Protein backbone atom coordinates (compact mmCIF):
# COMPACT_ATOMS: atom_id res chain seq x y z
CA UNK A 1 0.00 0.00 0.00
CA UNK A 2 1.13 3.56 -0.73
CA UNK A 3 1.23 5.70 2.39
CA UNK A 4 2.11 9.38 2.76
CA UNK A 5 3.83 10.37 5.99
CA UNK A 6 3.28 14.06 6.72
CA UNK A 7 6.02 15.28 9.05
CA UNK A 8 9.73 14.53 9.06
CA UNK A 9 10.42 14.90 12.77
CA UNK A 10 10.92 12.25 15.41
CA UNK A 11 7.48 10.63 15.07
CA UNK A 12 7.42 10.94 11.30
CA UNK A 13 10.70 9.05 11.16
CA UNK A 14 9.37 6.30 13.43
CA UNK A 15 6.17 5.87 11.43
CA UNK A 16 8.00 5.83 8.10
CA UNK A 17 10.56 3.31 9.35
CA UNK A 18 7.92 0.98 10.75
CA UNK A 19 5.66 1.16 7.71
CA UNK A 20 8.59 0.48 5.40
CA UNK A 21 9.49 -2.50 7.56
CA UNK A 22 5.94 -3.76 7.15
CA UNK A 23 6.14 -3.60 3.36
CA UNK A 24 4.40 -0.29 2.66
CA UNK A 25 5.50 2.15 -0.03
CA UNK A 26 6.22 5.37 1.86
CA UNK A 27 6.52 8.93 0.62
CA UNK A 28 7.54 11.61 3.12
CA UNK A 29 6.22 15.17 3.05
CA UNK A 30 7.24 18.10 5.21
CA UNK A 31 6.64 21.83 5.06
CA UNK A 32 10.40 22.13 4.85
CA UNK A 33 10.98 20.03 1.76
CA UNK A 34 14.66 19.57 2.61
CA UNK A 35 13.77 17.82 5.86
CA UNK A 36 11.60 15.35 3.95
CA UNK A 37 14.38 14.74 1.45
CA UNK A 38 16.95 14.11 4.18
CA UNK A 39 14.75 11.66 6.07
CA UNK A 40 13.77 9.82 2.88
CA UNK A 41 17.42 9.47 1.93
CA UNK A 42 18.23 8.10 5.37
CA UNK A 43 15.40 5.55 5.26
CA UNK A 44 15.69 4.68 1.57
CA UNK A 45 12.21 5.79 0.53
CA UNK A 46 10.61 8.55 -1.54
CA UNK A 47 9.89 12.16 -0.66
CA UNK A 48 8.02 14.84 -2.52
CA UNK A 49 7.39 18.57 -2.35
CA UNK A 50 4.80 19.47 0.26
CA UNK A 51 2.67 21.23 -2.32
CA UNK A 52 2.30 17.95 -4.23
CA UNK A 53 0.66 15.95 -1.46
CA UNK A 54 -2.86 16.43 -2.84
CA UNK A 55 -1.93 15.80 -6.47
CA UNK A 56 -0.75 12.26 -5.74
CA UNK A 57 -2.81 9.19 -4.88
CA UNK A 58 -2.22 7.30 -1.63
CA UNK A 59 -3.95 4.50 0.23
CA UNK A 60 -3.43 6.15 3.61
CA UNK A 61 -1.90 9.12 5.38
CA UNK A 62 0.07 9.58 8.59
CA UNK A 63 -0.13 12.97 10.32
CA UNK A 64 3.00 13.28 12.44
CA UNK A 65 3.42 17.05 12.61
CA UNK A 66 3.34 19.49 15.52
CA UNK A 67 0.02 19.45 17.38
CA UNK A 68 -0.99 22.92 16.25
CA UNK A 69 -0.95 21.77 12.61
CA UNK A 70 -3.11 18.66 13.05
CA UNK A 71 -6.53 20.18 12.46
CA UNK A 72 -5.55 22.09 9.33
CA UNK A 73 -3.94 19.01 7.79
CA UNK A 74 -6.76 16.69 8.81
CA UNK A 75 -9.37 19.03 7.35
CA UNK A 76 -7.58 18.89 4.02
CA UNK A 77 -7.00 15.11 4.04
CA UNK A 78 -10.30 13.81 5.42
CA UNK A 79 -12.34 14.63 2.26
CA UNK A 80 -10.04 12.29 0.31
CA UNK A 81 -11.72 9.37 2.11
CA UNK A 82 -8.53 7.44 2.86
CA UNK A 83 -7.54 6.10 6.31
CA UNK A 84 -5.47 8.47 8.44
CA UNK A 85 -3.20 7.76 11.39
CA UNK A 86 -2.99 10.97 13.44
CA UNK A 87 -0.67 11.31 16.40
CA UNK A 88 -2.51 12.38 19.52
CA UNK A 89 -4.16 14.76 20.03
CA UNK A 90 -6.45 15.56 17.14
CA UNK A 91 -6.72 18.99 18.74
CA UNK A 92 -6.33 20.57 22.16
CA UNK A 93 -9.99 21.66 22.11
CA UNK A 94 -13.16 19.57 22.11
CA UNK A 95 -14.77 21.92 19.59
CA UNK A 96 -12.11 21.39 16.93
CA UNK A 97 -12.00 17.67 17.68
CA UNK A 98 -15.76 17.44 17.15
CA UNK A 99 -15.50 19.31 13.85
CA UNK A 100 -12.87 16.87 12.58
CA UNK A 101 -14.93 13.87 13.69
CA UNK A 102 -18.05 15.26 12.00
CA UNK A 103 -16.15 15.80 8.76
CA UNK A 104 -14.69 12.29 8.95
CA UNK A 105 -18.18 10.85 9.43
CA UNK A 106 -19.44 12.86 6.46
CA UNK A 107 -16.79 11.44 4.12
CA UNK A 108 -16.58 7.99 5.70
CA UNK A 109 -12.92 8.52 6.56
CA UNK A 110 -11.29 6.36 9.23
CA UNK A 111 -9.03 8.29 11.62
CA UNK A 112 -6.85 6.12 13.85
CA UNK A 113 -5.55 8.09 16.83
CA UNK A 114 -1.99 7.49 18.01
CA UNK A 115 -2.49 6.13 21.52
CA UNK A 116 0.42 3.72 21.28
CA UNK A 117 0.13 2.32 24.80
CA UNK A 118 -2.80 0.15 23.65
CA UNK A 119 -0.29 -1.73 21.49
CA UNK A 120 2.30 -2.33 24.20
CA UNK A 121 2.30 -6.15 24.52
CA UNK A 122 2.10 -6.32 28.34
CA UNK A 123 -0.65 -3.68 28.47
CA UNK A 124 -2.55 -5.42 25.69
CA UNK A 125 -2.21 -8.75 27.51
CA UNK A 126 -3.49 -7.21 30.75
CA UNK A 127 -6.49 -5.69 28.94
CA UNK A 128 -7.36 -9.12 27.52
CA UNK A 129 -7.07 -10.70 30.97
CA UNK A 130 -9.47 -8.11 32.36
CA UNK A 131 -11.87 -8.63 29.45
CA UNK A 132 -11.73 -12.42 29.86
CA UNK A 133 -12.59 -12.15 33.55
CA UNK A 134 -9.23 -13.46 34.75
CA UNK A 135 -8.81 -10.52 37.16
CA UNK A 136 -12.37 -10.76 38.42
CA UNK A 137 -14.23 -7.71 39.64
CA UNK A 138 -11.97 -4.70 39.19
CA UNK A 139 -11.16 -2.93 42.43
CA UNK A 140 -8.56 -0.28 41.66
CA UNK A 141 -5.96 0.78 39.10
CA UNK A 142 -2.70 2.50 40.04
CA UNK A 143 -0.92 4.32 37.20
CA UNK A 144 2.50 5.96 36.99
CA UNK A 145 3.44 8.41 34.23
CA UNK A 146 6.92 9.79 34.85
CA UNK A 147 8.97 11.54 32.17
CA UNK A 148 12.74 11.27 32.35
CA UNK A 149 13.68 14.82 31.35
CA UNK A 150 11.64 18.01 31.85
CA UNK A 151 10.11 19.72 28.84
CA UNK A 152 11.71 22.58 26.95
CA UNK A 153 10.04 25.98 26.74
CA UNK A 154 9.45 25.41 23.02
CA UNK A 155 7.53 22.21 23.79
CA UNK A 156 5.53 23.77 26.61
CA UNK A 157 4.20 26.51 24.35
CA UNK A 158 2.03 24.04 22.44
CA UNK A 159 1.59 21.07 24.77
CA UNK A 160 -1.63 22.18 26.50
CA UNK A 161 -0.95 20.92 30.03
CA UNK A 162 0.32 17.87 31.86
CA UNK A 163 -3.23 16.50 31.58
CA UNK A 164 -3.75 17.13 27.86
CA UNK A 165 -0.24 16.02 26.90
CA UNK A 166 0.84 13.31 29.34
CA UNK A 167 -2.19 11.97 31.18
CA UNK A 168 -4.45 11.64 28.11
CA UNK A 169 -2.64 8.33 27.56
CA UNK A 170 -3.70 7.20 31.03
CA UNK A 171 -7.29 8.33 30.50
CA UNK A 172 -7.46 6.42 27.23
CA UNK A 173 -6.12 3.25 28.84
CA UNK A 174 -8.62 3.49 31.69
CA UNK A 175 -11.55 3.69 29.26
CA UNK A 176 -10.08 0.90 27.11
CA UNK A 177 -9.22 -1.51 29.92
CA UNK A 178 -12.33 -1.00 32.06
CA UNK A 179 -14.66 -0.63 29.06
CA UNK A 180 -16.41 2.18 30.90
CA UNK A 181 -16.36 5.96 30.87
CA UNK A 182 -14.65 8.16 33.44
CA UNK A 183 -17.32 9.74 35.64
CA UNK A 184 -15.53 12.00 38.13
CA UNK A 185 -12.02 13.38 38.65
CA UNK A 186 -10.15 15.19 41.38
CA UNK A 187 -6.70 16.55 40.57
CA UNK A 188 -3.91 18.31 42.43
CA UNK A 189 -0.62 19.59 41.06
CA UNK A 190 2.51 21.53 41.94
CA UNK A 191 5.72 22.96 40.54
CA UNK A 192 8.30 21.30 42.74
CA UNK A 193 11.55 21.78 40.85
CA UNK A 194 11.30 23.00 37.25
CA UNK A 195 10.01 26.55 37.23
CA UNK A 196 9.43 26.75 33.45
CA UNK A 197 6.11 24.98 34.03
CA UNK A 198 4.82 27.82 36.22
CA UNK A 199 5.13 30.23 33.29
CA UNK A 200 2.41 28.25 31.49
CA UNK A 201 0.27 27.56 34.58
CA UNK A 202 1.41 23.96 34.24
CA UNK A 203 3.01 21.57 36.72
CA UNK A 204 5.92 19.19 37.04
CA UNK A 205 4.02 16.86 39.40
CA UNK A 206 0.38 15.80 39.40
CA UNK A 207 -1.89 13.49 41.34
CA UNK A 208 -5.29 12.38 40.05
CA UNK A 209 -8.04 10.40 41.71
CA UNK A 210 -10.91 9.32 39.48
CA UNK A 211 -13.84 6.96 39.30
CA UNK A 212 -15.35 5.23 36.28
CA UNK A 213 -19.07 4.83 35.63
CA UNK A 214 -18.65 1.14 36.51
CA UNK A 215 -17.23 2.04 39.93
CA UNK A 216 -13.53 1.35 39.38
CA UNK A 217 -11.32 3.70 41.39
CA UNK A 218 -8.07 4.88 39.83
CA UNK A 219 -5.04 6.72 41.23
CA UNK A 220 -2.59 8.35 38.82
CA UNK A 221 0.71 10.01 39.63
CA UNK A 222 2.61 12.08 37.08
CA UNK A 223 5.99 13.78 37.06
CA UNK A 224 7.84 15.67 34.34
CA UNK A 225 11.22 14.60 35.71
CA UNK A 226 12.41 11.22 36.89
CA UNK A 227 16.20 11.22 37.45
CA UNK A 228 16.47 7.46 36.91
CA UNK A 229 14.58 7.22 33.60
CA UNK A 230 11.19 7.09 31.87
CA UNK A 231 8.72 5.25 34.07
CA UNK A 232 5.26 4.24 32.83
CA UNK A 233 3.62 1.51 34.87
CA UNK A 234 0.18 0.17 35.62
CA UNK A 235 -1.10 -1.98 38.47
CA UNK A 236 -4.50 -3.64 38.28
CA UNK A 237 -6.19 -5.07 41.37
CA UNK A 238 -9.25 -7.29 41.23
CA UNK A 239 -11.16 -9.99 43.10
CA UNK A 240 -9.24 -12.82 41.39
CA UNK A 241 -5.78 -11.45 40.63
CA UNK A 242 -3.38 -8.51 40.82
CA UNK A 243 -1.29 -7.46 37.81
CA UNK A 244 1.84 -5.34 37.40
CA UNK A 245 2.62 -3.93 33.95
CA UNK A 246 5.87 -2.16 33.16
CA UNK A 247 7.83 -3.62 36.06
CA UNK A 248 10.94 -5.23 34.60
CA UNK A 249 14.73 -5.01 34.60
CA UNK A 250 14.68 -1.66 32.78
CA UNK A 251 12.13 0.02 35.04
CA UNK A 252 13.76 3.21 36.35
CA UNK A 253 13.41 2.64 40.07
CA UNK A 254 15.76 1.39 42.78
CA UNK A 255 14.82 -1.67 44.82
CA UNK A 256 15.88 -1.02 48.42
CA UNK A 257 15.57 -4.72 49.33
CA UNK A 258 17.83 -5.65 46.42
CA UNK A 259 15.56 -8.48 45.27
CA UNK A 260 15.26 -7.35 41.63
CA UNK A 261 18.28 -7.61 39.35
CA UNK A 262 17.82 -4.32 37.46
CA UNK A 263 19.75 -3.63 34.26
CA UNK A 264 22.50 -0.97 34.48
CA UNK A 265 20.71 1.17 31.85
CA UNK A 266 17.00 1.95 32.25
CA UNK A 267 14.37 3.37 29.89
CA UNK A 268 15.56 6.85 28.95
CA UNK A 269 12.52 8.09 27.03
CA UNK A 270 9.04 7.26 25.80
CA UNK A 271 10.29 6.07 22.42
CA UNK A 272 12.55 3.45 23.97
CA UNK A 273 9.86 2.44 26.46
CA UNK A 274 7.21 2.04 23.74
CA UNK A 275 9.26 1.29 20.64
CA UNK A 276 7.58 -2.08 20.08
CA UNK A 277 4.17 -0.52 20.70
CA UNK A 278 4.79 2.13 18.04
CA UNK A 279 5.76 -0.58 15.55
CA UNK A 280 2.64 -2.64 16.26
CA UNK A 281 0.49 0.48 16.04
CA UNK A 282 1.95 1.37 12.64
CA UNK A 283 1.42 -2.21 11.46
CA UNK A 284 -2.21 -2.02 12.59
CA UNK A 285 -2.66 1.14 10.55
CA UNK A 286 -1.16 -0.61 7.53
CA UNK A 287 -3.75 -3.36 8.02
CA UNK A 288 -6.47 -0.72 8.28
CA UNK A 289 -5.48 0.74 4.91
CA UNK A 290 -5.82 -2.76 3.43
CA UNK A 291 -9.27 -3.20 4.95
CA UNK A 292 -8.08 -6.17 7.01
CA UNK A 293 -9.13 -4.83 10.43
CA UNK A 294 -11.53 -2.31 11.93
CA UNK A 295 -10.21 0.92 13.40
CA UNK A 296 -8.29 -0.04 16.59
CA UNK A 297 -8.40 3.47 18.06
CA UNK A 298 -11.20 5.67 16.65
CA UNK A 299 -11.28 9.46 17.13
CA UNK A 300 -13.85 9.28 19.92
CA UNK A 301 -10.99 7.92 22.04
CA UNK A 302 -9.13 11.21 21.63
CA UNK A 303 -12.26 13.24 22.31
CA UNK A 304 -13.15 11.46 25.55
CA UNK A 305 -9.57 11.49 26.88
CA UNK A 306 -9.41 15.22 26.15
CA UNK A 307 -12.67 15.81 28.03
CA UNK A 308 -11.20 14.11 31.09
CA UNK A 309 -8.05 16.23 30.83
CA UNK A 310 -10.14 19.39 30.73
CA UNK A 311 -12.11 18.19 33.76
CA UNK A 312 -8.80 17.77 35.63
CA UNK A 313 -7.88 21.35 34.78
CA UNK A 314 -11.25 22.50 36.10
CA UNK A 315 -10.64 20.53 39.29
CA UNK A 316 -7.32 22.34 39.71
CA UNK A 317 -9.07 25.71 39.37
CA UNK A 318 -11.90 24.93 41.78
CA UNK A 319 -10.12 22.62 44.20
CA UNK A 320 -13.13 20.31 43.94
CA UNK A 321 -14.01 17.01 42.27
CA UNK A 322 -15.48 17.51 38.80
CA UNK A 323 -18.01 15.39 36.95
CA UNK A 324 -16.82 14.62 33.42
Question: Where do the protein language model's features map onto the residues?
Answer:
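Beta-loop-alpha module in the N-terminal Rossmann-like domain of NAD(P)-dependent dehydrogenases
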Residues: 43-103
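Hydrophobic residues in well-ordered beta-strands that form the structural core
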Residues: 86, 111-113, 220, 245
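A contiguous active-site-proximal alpha/beta segment in oxidoreductase catalytic domains
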Residues: 68, 92-152
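C-terminal helix-rich "cap/oligomerization" subdomain common to oxidoreductases
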Residues: 20, 24, 60-63, 98, ...
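Rossmann-like dinucleotide-binding domain that binds NAD(P)(H)
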Residues: 153-217, 223-228, 300
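N-terminal Rossmann-like dinucleotide-binding module
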Residues: 1-43
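A short helix->loop->beta-strand "cap" motif at the edges of active sites that frequently abuts
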Residues: 80-82, 107-109, 216
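NAD(P)-dinucleotide binding in Rossmann-like oxidoreductases
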Residues: 198-199, 213-280
Amino acid sequence: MKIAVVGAGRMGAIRAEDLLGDGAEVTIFNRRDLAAEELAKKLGCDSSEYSQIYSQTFDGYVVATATNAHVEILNSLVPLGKPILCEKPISLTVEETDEVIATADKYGTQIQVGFQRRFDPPISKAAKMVSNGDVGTLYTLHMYAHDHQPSTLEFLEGSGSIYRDLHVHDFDLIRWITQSEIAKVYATQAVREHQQYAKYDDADVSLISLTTTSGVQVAITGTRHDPVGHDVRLEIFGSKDSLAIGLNKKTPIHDIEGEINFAPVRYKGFIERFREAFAKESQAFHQLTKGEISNPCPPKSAREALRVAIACEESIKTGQPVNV
